[in-house]
Each structure stands twice: as C-alpha cells, then as structure tokens.
A protein has these predicted regions:
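Acidic, low-complexity terminal tails and accessory targeting/binding regions
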Residues: 1-7, 52, 82-86, 92-107, ...
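Phosphate-handling substructures
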Residues: 17-18, 30-37, 78-140
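Active-site-proximal alpha-helix that buttresses catalytic centers in soluble enzyme cores
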Residues: 3-86
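Cofactor-binding loop segments of dinucleotide-utilizing enzymes, especially the Rossmann-like FAD-
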Residues: 13, 89, 159
Length: 171
C-alpha cells in the first residue's frame, strides 16, 4: 500500500496591532513582544486563512506560545474542531538587550536585525538569541514532529523571523 505523506503547513501569525500609545507598565521588551496582539485586520486575516482548503482536515495544530500566534491558531483549530498545542521552540527569535542590538546595527545598511543576524549567524546580545540558536530549537521541534506525527497533516503557527532562519537551513 502507498505510504501517506507527512504534510506540514508552516503559517506565520496574522498582522499585529501597532502599540504606539503611552505604556505605563513595567514590561520589558521581551514581554511586550510575547504579548503583542493581532490587529482587527489580523483577526480577519486569521479567520479567512482558517477557511483555506489546504488547512482543512488537519490532524494536529502546533503554535508558538506568543499571543499573536495563538490568536491565529485559534481560528485554524476552530475550523478543524481541534485544540492547538504550544511549543516554546516555535517562539520568535529573542532579540535580547536592545541597547546592545542598537550598537550592533548602527553601521549596518539593512536596518533589519533579523537580516543582519542571518549574515552573522552566531551574533547575539547578552540575553538574546543568535540565528544559530533559533535554527537549532526550530530543528528540534521539526525533527520531533516528523517522528511523532508521521503521515499526519499538521499546521504549525510561528513567526517570520524564526521561520526564515529555519528555511535557510532547509533550502
């Protein structure tokens, strides 16, 4: 009999809201990043995405634990009558100390830290993550689900930065 394929749909979370208002909170930049919510358009985007035929009849759904990823995954889960599972290995790359990152970026032409970290894959701030760190944990996740969910149809909701790092190694 024919062996069924394992299919993984890698989904980037929907659009987020710009939070440029006054912030009288004691949240650090990492906490702010993790709690970022979808915009009204992002909610609509996620709802529309969840109705995509490719994402029908899924066997399992995995998501980053960041709020924006879970907010995207909930629609896909609802349409498939499934719960979604969380894995920290799917988190966005941790930028870490923003002052250090600013120093690293000051003479760079791209103004895009994730782009620069792809060129210097081991660079990281004192409490941040390098592209290589991110690639390793994304691979841990991918290898595990390929083993545990063979012949399944899987949706994985993650982030542009970490997805980009994963794809560079896959290609």
């Amino acid at each position: 009999s024919k062996v069924k394929d394992t299919i993984i749909y890698l989904v980037r979370h929907a659009e987020t809201v710009d939070e440029n208002g006054i912030r009288n909170t004691n949240e650090d930049s990492q906490m702010i990043n993790e709690k970022e919510i979808l915009s009204v358009e992002g909610e609509e985007q996620a709802k529309k995405l969840s109705k995509n035929n490719e994402l029908k009849n899924l066997d399992i759904i995995w998501s980053s634990s960041y709020t924006r990823a879970k907010a995207t995954a909930k629609y896909i889960a609802y349409e498939n009558n499934l719960i979604f599972n969380l894995d920290n290995n799917l988190s966005e790359r941790k930028l870490g100390n923003l002052k250090e990152l600013g120093k690293f970026m000051k003479d760079k032409s791209t103004r895009d830290p994730s782009q620069e970290q792809l060129l210097d894959r081991n660079y990281k701030t004192s409490d941040g993550e390098s592209a290589e760190d991110t690639r390793k944990r994304m691979n841990i996740f991918l290898n595990r689900i390929l083993k545990e969910y063979e012949e399944n149809k899987i949706a994985v909701v993650s982030h542009r930065g970490s997805d980009k790092i994963l794809f560079i190694k896959l290609v």
